[in-house]
């Protein structure tokens, strides 16, 4: 039986190390700007994708300009007024300015949200989950539940990893296709909503890392004694530290995955 004990006892420690490593790595990458997240991917977006969609957007801007005129003016002889013409021209100017400023605006949003999230994380004194000191009885209990803890740690770590990295990929796509969305401004009601939708999505995806950082800090402050009497936990032989760490990991993974939904429901963006 000794080989079983020696084989299962490190599983709890392995789960703790996997979770802390993946969470620290994901937070470090998630709080960085897309430019520093992957310089090669950002170079592809900045040098190829963005100019490509910008060229298409310049053509689409002219098309939506004529569509906007046709939609706002039913009878050119009777309905074409100076006010209508000025309104459409202002939209064209804004669209042209926006097409050439999408990258600057995106970089500004990325830097603001990344800096804010980093400040929140540094001031929150986040350290990850702790293994704690185990006596002989607790070590035996942790040996039994070590497999379950390791599985929970791997699943939660994978959820956080996929969520944060998919968010970063979406930020690259948002910066690239931004000119197409902005070119819809002169299209009139309905079509011009694409520009607003792009801005809302950019803000949601960018600000979600701030919500994630705050949520992780809040969850790390939880303790089982907040929900159960301390005497009850000390009198019953329970792997309290293991249960608390599993609770923190599952709640953190759920919060990271639901950050976008929280932003949409709370701020309507």
Identify the residue ranges that each predicted region occupies.
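Alpha-helical transmembrane segments and their helix-start/interface "positive-inside/aromatic belt" motifs
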Residues: 1-11, 83-99, 195-206
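Short alpha-helical basic/polar micro-motif
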Residues: 67, 87, 163, 167, ...
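Surface-exposed substrate-engagement region within the catalytic domains
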Residues: 204-209, 213-214
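Binding/recognition "hotspot" determinant
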Residues: 1-60
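Hydrophobic transmembrane alpha-helix segments characteristic of membrane transport
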Residues: 60-96, 177-192
């Amino acid at each position: 039986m000794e080989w079983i004990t020696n084989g299962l006892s490190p599983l709890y420690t392995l789960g703790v190390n996997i979770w802390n490593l993946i969470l620290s790595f994901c937070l470090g990458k998630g709080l960085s700007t897309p430019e520093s997240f992957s310089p090669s991917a950002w170079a592809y977006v900045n040098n190829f994708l963005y100019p490509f969609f910008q060229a298409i957007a310049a053509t689409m801007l002219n098309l939506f300009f004529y569509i906007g005129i046709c939609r706002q003016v039913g009878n050119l002889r009777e309905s074409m007024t100076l006010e209508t013409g000025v309104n459409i021209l202002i939209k064209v100017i804004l669209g042209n300015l926006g097409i050439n400023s999408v990258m600057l605006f995106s970089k500004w949003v990325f830097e603001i949200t990344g800096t804010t999230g980093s400040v929140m994380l540094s001031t929150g004194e986040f350290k990850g989950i702790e293994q704690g000191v185990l006596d002989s009885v607790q070590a035996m209990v942790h040996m039994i539940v070590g497999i379950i803890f390791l599985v929970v740690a791997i699943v939660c770590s994978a959820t956080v990893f996929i969520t944060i990295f998919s968010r970063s990929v979406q930020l690259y796509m948002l910066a690239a296709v931004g000119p197409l969305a902005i070119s819809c401004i002169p299209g009139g009601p309905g079509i011009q909503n694409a520009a607003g939708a792009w801005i809302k999505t950019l803000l949601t995806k960018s600000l979600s890392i701030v919500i994630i950082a705050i949520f992780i800090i809040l969850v790390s402050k939880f303790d089982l004694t907040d929900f159960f009497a301390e005497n009850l936990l000390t009198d019953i032989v329970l792997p309290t530290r293991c249960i608390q760490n599993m609770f923190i990991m599952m709640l953190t993974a759920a919060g990271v995955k639901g950050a976008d939904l929280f932003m949409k429901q709370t701020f309507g963006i």
